[in-house]
């Protein structure tokens, strides 16, 4: 049986930008079953975000094809900061911050990759043991300053200044690849396009110290842009996190289900494990019946399940269906808070109040006349029930958990009213 061609699959999915030695990597994959590959992430925060999924999806595909992925947490480099993609110096973190972030990221990665045929390493293990004299003698002599200055990541910072600390980051990352290659048999490094210079520096160091025939390869990923030309990865509310405490499964699901028709097929290829045939079928449905949003629903389903599991997906779908249909009575307070986090909000007292006054006082309606008209026309729902009597009294004692009264105006215009 022929081997699965992982590189061709990645190309079809639009996941490869540059390769250092495609022919050499293909030859290695054809002759060996033991490829190990890695990508690094510095513990600059306590949660991964969807931008991290871009390289991680490639590692996951290699893992599913039987290869050995390694994620390198930059406990050493994270204390310094990668200048790639930045115009200003990073604020250095305390040792306590770095340690806390490392633990949080490790737990998230284990959820994505499991524990079989997967490894998490920390470069503090070896970088922390190198003193300045050893650094200069054993590694520094292999790096030419003129070459380092010409790397894009450094050249773009020279005008405004770059510290020696960040200038040496590429040497530290090169040491990482050298260490993992020599001691752990890692042959391939994955990174974003802005990591090309750091990756090639690592390969050069390996070849200088271990010989030019030592297998060492690099692969970078294209910059993910949306159809409107903006960078992928942000929602209207900012970063989309993998931590459910920062971005709830419902918000996460909504991010994917609201993707543009022009982007959705690209994201299906990149962020799901659906087959070529399944994706092509969804592409056809998007073209013929875009209003059904079949591709967006499948995208949201697959990525939410991958990150938050079956339970997180079911909850996200339950909240979505309830808010869409208006049948919200079976939602828990936590689910209501998830679903209406970004909805307009208001406050009201704990006393009963006529519905017309309630709507005006909470600024849901601009005037009593408009409030009466909307109530009579059946456009107002209180906690899921349509109220058409202008004499109806809103009773806070019937609020969800004694805390929230939910007003819906029209089909899906919700306001979350907190009872004080």
From Swiss-Prot:
The keyword Glycoprotein does not apply. ATP binds at residue 234. A motif ('HIGH' region) lies at residues 43-52. L-tyrosine binds at residues 38, 169, 173. PROSITE patterns: AA_TRNA_LIGASE_I, S4. GO terms for biological process: tyrosyl-tRNA aminoacylation. The keyword Signal does not apply. It catalyses: tRNA(Tyr) + L-tyrosine + ATP = L-tyrosyl-tRNA(Tyr) + AMP + diphosphate + H(+). Homodimer. This is Tyrosine--tRNA ligase. It comes from Lactobacillus acidophilus (strain ATCC 700396 / NCK56 / N2 / NCFM).
